[in-house]
């Protein structure tokens, strides 16, 4: 974070009530900057359904903003969230896919709806994401003349466990241009130490887990509310024998091990027949069903317009590991299908599921090119 480049910038800080965004505010204020502070409200549809963690989030954000002499403004993006992110999630789950609502929340809400409501008044939007950026000097032709240009890249955090580039891999180039990650170069332990040293009210607060708006709401209860239940059979893949029953295929994802309620396990979900409403499970001893090494990704979204190279690393879920792979453009009648690739991973990957985002990085797992949806 170059303070010289930020001196004359109007900066909006998105406070969530957590320790990360609170340290973001501290980092900016200690360098003499006066950012605007905002809390985005995206809670459940009815106010009475807000749990204590949602109320606590706002209380924490208010306390931290006041500590540094900033006024906190609450921005209601509840309707946009439920109209866009929830619809995306329910449509995907109903179709038997495995979506990631937090990925779309960043694109559609934090850097989308918020920008439309208040973010457009600011040059930069600062968040507590563990990610970094870098600017590459480029050469480009403008009106027949060679001109200097700049290309901004989304890059990984030095903390592999906390790195959140996978959650940011669907944002647009203009959103990346406005993004500022003041703690992205830090390790989580360092952020905690700063919070404790500065006596922040949430210094010892646990990190949030799961989908950003649910708080303590159970994800299956959330699905049940919008999709209901649809009982069906659980079948052992190898034998075709019915060994149990489920309450709806949308409650289960490929690779899932827990929550099946079956004896004699462990059992893994390896396949879903959406039309017949059948969940297929296996003990995981068949690598051809439990693991995949080659799979297609469609509608690849490039963050800054740069196409990924052949040799890459990737993630299909939020883990510290990056898997080496190669990308092969998918062709149809000798013509490439726009933004579609066949992934050839260097090793079999467990739990590859349709609807997941495959996040693509360079072979040093430093620069993030973007992500595409797996369509196994």
Q: For each predicted feature, which ranges?
A:
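ATP-dependent adenylation/nucleotidyltransferase module used to activate substrates
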Residues: 1-169, 180, 196, 269
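AMP-forming adenylation/ATP pyrophosphatase catalytic core
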Residues: 6, 126-132, 137-140, 149-376
